[in-house]
Amino acid sequence: MPPSISAFQAAYIGIEVLIALVSVPGNVLVIWAVKVNQALRDATFCFIVSLAVADVAVGALVIPLAILINIGPETYFHTCLMVACPVLILTQSSILALLAIAVDRYLRVKIPLRYKAVVTPRRAAVAIAGCWILSLVVGLTPMFGWNNLREVQRAWAANGSVGEPVIKCEFEKVISMEYMVYFNFFVWVLPPLLLMVLIYLEVFYLIRRQLSKKASASSGDPHKYYGKELKIAKSLALILFLFALSWLPLHILNCVTLFCPSCQKPSILVYTAIFLTHGNSAMNPIVYAFRIHKFRVTFLKIWNDHFRCRPAPAGDGDEDLPEEKPND
């Protein structure tokens, strides 16, 4: 270990590595499950795959870059900016994937009979591509000029230096807090989160109303359908809650930095907020395993088929996976 790394930094790196070691395999397992189980091929699970891809990238790319920034190497301004932007792209992709999931669940309970005609695989693919393109635009905005280059250049010139500034690479040194608060948080994080809360409230209202009507009419299949929708909606709302719980503290700290520059932010608070944002990428597979039956069964099948030391018992083949049913 290089002598320049303090004990505190070593602890930080250790926690980040642990998060990555949970996040990457867990989300790869989610993608694998959707690939092997035909019952996990509807639009919702395609959006979940998009979310899992972003979470894999957090563990495989963002966390190593965060460790690099924490060590604080000296580099050119735009090189540091390129290191800082991936987390913005992936965060935005996660938010838009969660929004797409919420809209998809709303359509499933609002227009159940027309759902498959409206939400086609092609449209779902277009929506996913649109989410990623928009995420790239939002996340790369600092590369287009909304950054701290002018301030850094002034300090660089004041020291009599010429050429592109060489700085100690830190997130707040290159990313403008005006961008993070006014554009990223107030436009692309907070409004989508509030919209998703409203959508899930409407979803729960529609499901409760349908369950009440169907129960009173003693209907079988519709009651079962909306019961399943309620269970899945609760699980996905939990994913949304965990995302908000993980990301809002860091955005609130950014607001403090912008609106109260003289306010001191305890290092432990900042690092806790960072750990929450990265740790969120490891939470989703755990929620899927405990809350969504199709995922749990498929995870067990993958484990039995590929990782157990002894052969899986007969009958653990594809026939044991949950079968896809209309509107299931």
From Swiss-Prot:
| Protein name from the UniProt record | Adenosine receptor A1
Q: Which residues cross the membrane?
A: 11-33, 47-69, 81-102, 124-146, 177-201, 236-259, 268-292
Disulfide pairs here are 80-169
Task: Please report which protein family the annotation says this sequence is part of.
Answer: Belongs to the G-protein coupled receptor 1 family.
- Origin species: Oryctolagus cuniculus (Rabbit)
Describe the task this protein carries out. Receptor for adenosine. The activity of this receptor is mediated by G proteins which inhibit adenylyl cyclase.
From the UniProt record, give one GO term of the biological process aspect: regulation of glomerular filtration
Q: Which GO terms describe its molecular function?
A: G protein-coupled adenosine receptor activity
Q: What Pfam families does the record tag this protein with?
A: 7tm_1 (PF00001)
Phylogenetic classification of the source organism: Eukaryota, Metazoa, Chordata, Craniata, Vertebrata
Q: Where in the cell is it found?
A: Cell membrane
One GO cellular component term noted in the UniProt record for this chain: dendritic spine
InterPro entries for the chain:
Adeno_A1_rcpt (IPR001068), Adenosn_rcpt (IPR001634), GPCR_Rhodpsn (IPR000276), GPCR_Rhodpsn_7TM (IPR017452)
Question: Where would I find glycosylation on this chain?
Answer: 159
Lipid attachment in record (S-palmitoyl cysteine): 309
Output the PANTHER family linked to this UniProt entry.
Answer: ADENOSINE RECEPTOR A1 (PTHR24246:SF1), OLFACTORY RECEPTOR AND ADENOSINE RECEPTOR (PTHR24246)
In this UniProt entry, which residues form the Cytoplasmic topological domain(s)?
Answer: 34-46, 103-123, 202-235, 293-328
Q: Which residues lie on this side of the membrane: Extracellular?
A: 1-10, 70-80, 147-176, 260-267
Q: Which UniProt keywords apply?
A: Cell membrane, Disulfide bond, G-protein coupled receptor, Glycoprotein, Lipoprotein, Membrane, Palmitate, Receptor, Transducer, Transmembrane, Transmembrane helix
What topology does the record note for this protein and the membrane? Multi-pass membrane protein
